[in-house]
Amino acid sequence: GLDLVLIDYLQLLDMRSDNRSYGREAEVSQTSRAIKVLSKELGIPVILLSQINRNCESRESKIPILADLRESGAIEQDADTVMFIHREEYYDSNAEKGLGLLSVAKQRDGRTGKIAFRYNEPLTQISDARDSSQKGSKDNINSQKENVPF
């Protein structure tokens, strides 16, 4: 049987019926809810990727927050867990290369927080930021982490 569903990405799904016309936000909300129902009916997790809006680009901290989910508050409401991936070097060319942050913004049955990681872009490989064999020091990484949930 099916153990997991991965959907890349929510805003590409079209759930409109032939005889109804929805606004974009209502359509995304309907799709989000339908996927939540599907997950419950099948008894399997669904990993649903979604775009974020550009609001974070106007803030000092570029780390995405729940309000940045694009086109629907229903995504935040329907999801059991919401995580964002942030790479400071995307916004700041002087930032340390290869360092990322996984922000657990919502976790229905657990704690939220941020987890630092390293990534190797040419290999599309992610590794533990605390691994001292990677570029950078543990002290630098620890200064990047807050409230690690795991």
Give the label of every model feature segment.
Residues 1-2, 19, 33-43, 54-150:
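C-terminal regions of RecA-like/P-loop NTPase motor modules
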Residues 2-48:
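Helical hairpin unit composed of two closely spaced alpha helices linked by a short loop
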